[in-house]
Each structure stands twice: as structure tokens, then as C-alpha cells.
Amino acid sequence: YLAVLIWVIIKNWKEYKINKKDILIILTIILALVGILSIYFIKSADALKLITGTDYPGKRFETGGKEIKTIFSYVYSILFPYKIDTIGNPCELSSMISFYPIPMLIALVYLKKNIKNKKHFAFLIPMLIISIVYSVFMIFGVNETFAKLSLLYMTPPGRLAIPLGFSQILLIVYMLGNFKKEDIILKSEWLKKVGTLLSSIAIMYIALKTDMNILQNHPIYIYICGLILIYGIYQIVNINKEENKKRLIMLLIPVAILTGVSVHPIQKGISVLTDKPVAKKTQEIVSQDKENNLWICDSTNFMINNYLLASGAKIINSTNLYTNFDLYKTVLGEEKSQRPEVRYVYNRYSHINMEITADINDIELIQQDSLKIYLTSEKVKELGVKYILTTRYLEQFNTDDIVYKKLYDEDGMIIYYVEY
């Protein structure tokens, strides 16, 4: 967006004269923006403090590199709405169908050929700077000084795949709207065809090497993605011609529709919250004990934890949006909770699993965004927990002061009342 803003300013700078009315409008807009941002920072002060006070990612420092797979995942991202068995979370590889790096290379070739007349430079140069910086950051990485100055140090390199793809799409859209017949990229038809074929093979090779086995076991997918790639790149190389512009648009429209319309709803209806026995029992307990129904889930996954939350329970270990420092201090103790190796586990956004133990109070990083807390029955009492949903029997953890009383046991889901 900054690159687009620079282009708009440069394009209209000489043609537009600013008068007093314009200055007043600009000042009003600036004041309005300052006011909106001030309100946001004031109201979000506590949340921002929690976020920036966390080692991960509040004190994250990224320098990029080794993230080539998400750059080229657009080659097979059209398959994500359909059945893919080799990847559990396709959104981690989601990206825009951008034909990267072809739009960027076409723009570079055009700049070199038109260095004297500087036609279209106002748009192409800012957009290319953004594209190149993002590409270098993702593929090779940068030093700490550049990461700090560019404000990329808080950005995981994989998360740049979408804005990088968006920059390529903006280049394509600009070329579609502004390149004329005289804006020739390559004169030789033979060079265009050979370049299209070689670049398609190179892109497909990289995609196959980094695709987490999405394409390898499905030859038909390779053919489909390869044909889209070859056809699309050839039209981009000839984007100065009206007939090729139309062909590119006619390719992208059905691809966009087929990749969007086929996405199934995550859940239809709310019967999962109204008809399931464990949900009904949870809601019954919540309605009878509105003030003290503090829960945890033991030996479950984050989906069960959040399911309990959706059923109306006050649950400690649902997916946390902010770091719960009080929880960690209670379970681990003041000193241990502040150790660097322990703080590294903390996360602004985290799925929290819990497991009651006989004598261990500890925390473990399972993977990014997911941690596990081990706690004794004494810590359960300190936290004020009254109800536990679990998949195992907890009577073995009874103590002289704490007793787990079973309230519900059906289909592998068990609810306990904690008496102390």
C-alpha cells in the first residue's frame, strides 16, 4: 500500500495544485487518524503491554531466510479446498496465485528497456523495491540492522508470502490496465516460448521439492498446475497485447471461482453445542453453579478445551490470546516462571493443554503456539478449579485435602467435581 501511495503522489504531483481547502482537509484527516489511533492505544494499553512483554513473540527478532516453500506454494494452493492427505493445516501454506517471480522479472526487464523515457517508473520502482526486499528476507535472510530498520524483525518470514504475492498481483493488474502494444517486453517469439517453458519448469521443480508431498502422489495435480502455470506465464510475457490480456483474465476468473466456491463451511448449524451429551452436561453444571464454575481440561487437545468454552464454561486452558502470567506464577512459582528458558515457552497466542500429575509442576513447549502444563492436585486447588473435563480417571490423584468426584462418564469424556 505504501508503494501504491508513492505512485499516486508521484503521478499526480505536477498536475494537482494544493489550495487552502485541500490543506484543511488533509489536516482534518491527519487529526482524525491521530485521534482514532490514540483511542486504540489507550483502550488497548493493557493488551499491548501483555503482548510486548512476552518473550515469544513479544521479544521475537526475526532475520528471515529459508522460507522458499511458502513463496511457491501458490502453484498448488488451488488444491487446498479439496482433499489433501499430506498436510494437516493448509492455511500455513496458503498464498495468492501470483505467478511469482514472473511479474517482478517482467517489470525489471521493462525498466531496463525503458531506462531513458522512464515510462511507468513511478509505479514499477516502488513495487519492485517492496517485492525484492520481501524476496530477499524470505529466501536469504538479512542482518539484524536491516531487519530492525525495515520493521521486519517481528515478522516470521513465512507470513510474508501473502503480501509478496499481493505485490505480484498488483504488478499484473497494473500491466493489464496500463501496458499498451508498444510496451514490448520481449521481441522474439521464440525467446518468449522458451522462457515461458524454462521458467515454468523451474517454478514447478521448486514447488515439487518444497510441497510437503502434496503433488508427488497425484500426477494429475502436477499436470493441472503445470498447464495453468505455463499458460498464465505466457500471457503475462505478452501482456502488452489486448488478446493476451483477455486470455489471462479468462484463465484467472475460473481459477479464482473454483478455489473459492468449493470451500466447505467449517460447521453447519449449532447442534454440536446443543445435542451432544457432554455439552448438555456442561451447560447444566454452568447453569447450576454460575459463580464458581471454573474449569480446566486434562489430557485433551485444544479443540476439546475450546468446545468447553463454547458450551459456556469458564475455562483456564482454552486458547489464550494473551500470556497468562498469573497462571504460570501459580503453577511454577515466582522464581521459576521468570527463568529465560521458561519464559521462552510463553506465547501471546497459545493452545494450552494440561495434565494433572502426582508431583510435577512444569511447562513444556510442544510446538510454536502450543504448550503443555503439568500440575499437581495442590496447584489445581490454588488455581481455584472446581470442575475438570478429562479423558482419564483422576481418582489416583486424590489427596487428604483434595478429592475428585465423578459427575459424568460417557463416550470417553469424564467430568469431575474437585472437592477441597
Question: Which residue ranges define each predicted feature?
Answer:
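Transmembrane helices and adjacent periplasmic/lumenal helix-loop junctions
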Residues: 1-11, 32-46, 89-98, 257-265
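Transmembrane alpha-helical segments
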Residues: 199-215, 235, 250-271
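Membrane-interfacial entry segments at the cytosolic side of transmembrane helices
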Residues: 14-29, 118-123, 185-194, 217-222, ...
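Periplasmic/ER-lumenal interhelical loops and adjacent helix-loop junctions
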Residues: 37-123
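Transmembrane alpha-helices and membrane-interface helical segments
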Residues: 4-11, 106-110, 128-132, 161-182, ...
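Membrane-helix boundary/interfacial segments in multi-pass membrane proteins
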Residues: 117-123, 132-191, 202-225
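P-loop NTPase catalytic cores that bind/hydrolyze ATP
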Residues: 30-34, 91-130, 298-302, 311, ...
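Soluble catalytic regions of membrane-associated enzymes that act on cell-envelope
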Residues: 124, 262-420
